[in-house]
Design a protein with these regions (language model features):
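Contiguous, non-catalytic segments that form substrate-binding/exosite surfaces or channel walls
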Residues: 1-89, 282
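Glycine- and acidic
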Residues: 17-26, 50, 85-97, 114-128, ...
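Conserved helix-loop functional segments at active or binding sites
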Residues: 44-51, 80, 110, 114-120, ...
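Active-site recognition of the HExxH zinc-binding catalytic motif
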Residues: 95-115, 135, 140, 238
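Short, aromatic-rich amphipathic segments at membrane interfaces
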Residues: 310-345
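C-terminal membrane-anchoring or membrane-association module
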Residues: 352-371
Length: 371
């Protein structure tokens, strides 16, 4: 999904209609073709990942198909643990687009985490930030092989994967702000919730959910809000770390893969900030780190691809920024727009994380009063 005209402009010269047309051809892919393609990508990325993928496939630990008219299937995709077998199982309800490939890569990241986990089920917990990085990080790393996997669709696939992460980083902050507004106002009516969600979305420039008059009620389609309160923000923090890993992969591919494999071996309950620090990654709650990440992403977006960025680094003389075009001033302005989008979202993350403590105290106080 396109986040803004600025981001689309930065990538428009590299992503043309022909690339999207090539991705559209994947609509006719069979499940076996999807498994073959993603399996090849895992083999190219790291032999260990290829080995785990073959284990998953040989033991039929997946259900990947589209629902037929007479068969009802759960929407979306997920991975569940099978603790009695010390295994996991991937479920994907296909929508017959290139997203089926993305879904398998994402869920395979979760599968790998279960594969390497050694803590018995009854003793284990999990940190959503790390768990989602194990899947989102694999999505971002897979873009390196988009050319061999998707042919002419490589630039469109890379753009869609990167913009998905930016989208999640921003909307996760928006959802968190909405949750806190609801929990700190126990008497809020449904209409008030719908109006409040629209107000919050408007403060984020209103790009994300459909508006109906002065209300926006598509938040009801987010199941996490009902069964796992305050969970969704973890998708945003992990998305930023996935983007950080992607930037690192352009500087040191082998090092980035080693970091990813190391994070997989951290297990399901590794603490987020401690894990990021241990592997030398940016702290998404540190303003300086986020500013640096936004600059790096803006520079890469300005060149149109990670490959162009790498080529630019080797071709530019010392002191000259890579990827600068003849329209240098306009590109710089667009880079600042990208930075603003990311910084605005992260600023909200920092504030909201502090407010979570207050929300908990309010809830505890209400419970005590009822008793």
């Amino acid at each position: 999904m396109v986040l803004s005209d600025n981001i689309w402009y930065l990538w428009s010269e590299a992503v043309d209609n022909a690339s999207y047309d090539s991705l559209d051809l994947l609509e006719d892919s069979t499940t076996e073709e999807i498994l073959d393609t993603v399996g090849d990508g895992m083999d190219q990325m790291a032999p260990k990942l290829g080995e785990v993928f073959r284990y998953m496939r040989d033991n039929h630990l997946y259900d990947i198909q589209a629902g037929e008219d007479s068969v009802e299937r759960t929407d979306g995709s997920y991975t569940v643990g099978l603790p009695s077998y010390r295994d996991a199982f991937i479920f994907i309800n296909r929508d017959n687009t290139f997203r089926d490939y993305q879904s398998l890569i994402h869920e395979f990241g979760h599968f790998c985490s279960y594969y390497y986990n050694t803590v018995p089920e009854m003793y284990q917990g999990f940190h959503v930030d790390v768990c989602e990085l194990q899947s989102q990080g694999l999505e971002m790393l897979s873009t390196r092989y988009a050319g061999s996997l998707f042919g002419e669709g490589d630039s469109a696939y890379t753009y869609e994967t990167m913009s998905d992460m930016l989208y999640v980083a921003i909307t996760a902050c928006m959802i968190q702000e909405f949750e806190e507004a609801v929990y700190t106002t126990p008497d809020m009516t449904l209409d008030d919730m719908n109006r409040r969600f629209k107000e919050i979305q408007d403060s984020y420039d209103g790009w994300y959910y459909r508006v109906y008059g002065n209300m926006c009620y598509d938040w009801v389609d987010i199941p996490h809000l009902f069964y796992s309160p305050m969970y969704y923000i973890g998708y945003g923090t992990s998305a930023l770390s996935a983007l950080d890993l992607w930037v690192l992969s352009g500087e040191d591919w082998d090092g980035a893969v080693d970091i990813y494999l190391g994070i997989l071996n951290e297990g399901l309950e590794a603490p987020y900030r401690g894990t990021m620090d241990r592997w030398g990654m940016k702290d998404v709650f540190d303003e300086a780190d986020i500013k640096e990440l936004s600059l790096e992403l803006g520079r890469i977006a300005g060149t149109g691809s990670m490959e162009a960025e790498e080529a630019g680094n080797s071709a530019q003389p010392d002191g000259e920024a890579p990827g600068v075009s003849a329209n240098e001033t306009s590109a710089a302005q667009d880079n600042r727009s990208v930075q603003f989008i990311i910084l605005a979202g992260i600023g909200t993350v920092i504030v909201l994380q502090v407010l979570i403590i207050s929300v908990g105290l309010v809830i505890l106080w209400e419970v005590r009063k009822k008793r």
